[in-house]
C-alpha cells in the first residue's frame, strides 16, 4: 500500500451511546489509522457527546463537535440530517490536507485492518472513486451480509478519494444523497464498488431507526428524486415485494415514488444527471435479461 494516504473520517452521530464506545475503540485500533476523525453530534439525548468527548481525550486524531440541539425535523433522514451534519464537520478542516474523505456512522465497527485494506484497493485502481467493505449485522454467531449490488456503496461507511469527492461537488444535503453521489461519480468516469472480503459490523439493523415500510417508502422517494424511470420503479417494486412483510414492502416502495411525484418533490435539477441515470438503469435491465444493448439502439 502507498504509505501516503491521509484519511479524514467524519461521523455524524445521534443517540449512539449503546454502540459508540465499540466504534471508537475500533477506529483507534486501526492498523492504518486516519489522519483525523471528527465526530459531529447532532443533538443526542442519550449521553453520546459525553462518551465521545471522554474517549477523544486519549485519541490524538479525534475531535468532537457537539451541536447541543439536533437540527433535524420530524423526519431527519428525509431532510438530509446526516449529510448536513457531515458537511458541518468538513467545514472544520482544510480538505487539501487529505487524500480520502470517509463517512462513518456511529453504529459501524471496523475490523482492525479495514482502512489498510480499503486504501490498498484505492491504490490498485486509480479510477476507483467511492468504495467500502461489506456490512454484516446480527448476533456474532449468525451475522449475515447486508446484500447490495457490487456497484453500490453503503451510505454508513462510504470512502471517497478527494479527487472524486470534489468532482461530484461533495454531498448533497437531501434525501437520496447516497444515490446521487454514486451516480455523479460514475458519470464523471469514476468507479464505485463495495468489497466483500473485509466486512464491518453494523450494530443497529438497517432500517430499524425508521421502520421497514417507512424505509421502503423513502427508497421510493429517492428513486423519484434521482429520475429513475417508472418502468424501473415498477420492476423494482415487484422484487422488493418479496421481502417481509410480503407484498407490503413493494407497495410501500411504489407509494413513496408516487407520493413524491404528486407532491412534486424537488429532483436533481441537472439534465445530464437525468440522462445518465436513466441510461445506466437501461443497461442494467438489459444485462439482467441477457440482451445485448446494441439490439435496442
What are these regions (language model features)?
Residues 34-43, 65-67:
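Short beta-strand/loop segment that forms part of the nucleotide-sugar
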Residues 41-50, 69, 108:
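A conserved acidic beta->alpha catalytic loop
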Residues 72, 109-144:
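Conserved donor NDP-sugar-binding/catalytic core segment of glycosyltransferases
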Residues 97-109:
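Short beta-strand-to-loop acidic/aromatic patch adjacent to the donor-nucleotide binding site
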Residues 154-169:
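Conserved nucleotide-sugar donor-binding
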Residues 214-297:
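Non-catalytic, C-terminal membrane-associated alpha-helical segments of glycosyltransferases
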Amino acid at each position: 500500500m502507498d504509505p501516503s494516504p491521509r484519511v479524514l473520517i467524519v461521523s455524524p452521530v445521534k443517540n449512539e451511546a449503546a454502540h459508540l464506545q465499540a466504534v471508537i475503540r475500533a477506529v483507534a485500533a486501526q492498523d492504518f489509522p486516519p489522519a483525523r476523525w471528527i465526530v459531529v453530534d447532532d443533538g443526542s439525548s442519550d449521553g453520546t457527546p459525553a462518551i465521545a468527548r471522554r474517549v477523544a481525550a486519549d485519541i490524538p486524531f479525534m475531535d468532537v463537535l457537539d451541536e447541543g440541539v439536533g437540527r433535524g425535523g420530524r423526519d431527519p433522514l428525509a431532510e438530509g440530517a446526516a449529510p448536513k451534519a457531515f458537511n458541518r464537520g468538513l467545514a472544520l478542516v482544510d480538505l487539501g490536507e487529505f487524500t480520502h474523505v470517509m463517512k462513518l456512522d456511529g453504529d459501524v465497527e471496523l475490523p482492525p485492518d479495514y482502512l489498510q485494506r480499503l486504501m490498498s484497493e484505492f491504490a490498485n485502481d486509480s479510477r476507483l472513486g467511492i468504495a467500502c467493505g461489506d456490512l454484516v449485522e446480527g448476533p456474532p454467531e449468525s451475522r449475515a451480509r447486508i446484500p447490495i449490488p457490487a456497484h453500490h456503496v453503503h451510505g454508513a461507511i462510504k470512502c471517497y478519494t478527494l479527487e472524486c469527492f470534489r468532482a461530484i461537488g461533495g454531498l448533497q444535503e437531501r434525501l437520496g444523497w447516497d444515490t446521487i453521489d454514486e451516480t455523479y461519480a460514475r458519470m464523471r468516469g469514476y468507479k464505485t464498488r463495495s468489497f466483500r472480503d473485509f466486512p464491518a459490523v453494523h450494530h443497529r439493523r438497517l432500517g430499524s431507526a425508521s421502520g421497514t415500510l417507512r424505509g421502503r417508502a423513502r427508497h421510493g422517494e429517492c428513486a423519484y428524486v434521482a429520475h429513475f424511470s417508472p418502468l424501473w420503479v415498477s420492476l423494482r417494486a415487484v422484487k422488493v415485494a418479496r421481502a417481509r412483510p410480503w407484498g407490503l414492502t413493494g407497495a410501500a416502495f411504489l407509494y413513496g415514488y408516487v407520493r413524491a411525484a404528486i407532491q412534486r418533490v424537488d429532483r436533481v435539477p441537472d439534465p445530464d444527471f437525468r440522462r445518465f441515470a436513466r441510461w445506466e438503469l437501461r443497461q442494467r435491465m438489459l444485462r439482467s435479461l441477457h440482451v445485448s444493448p446494441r439490439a435496442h439502439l
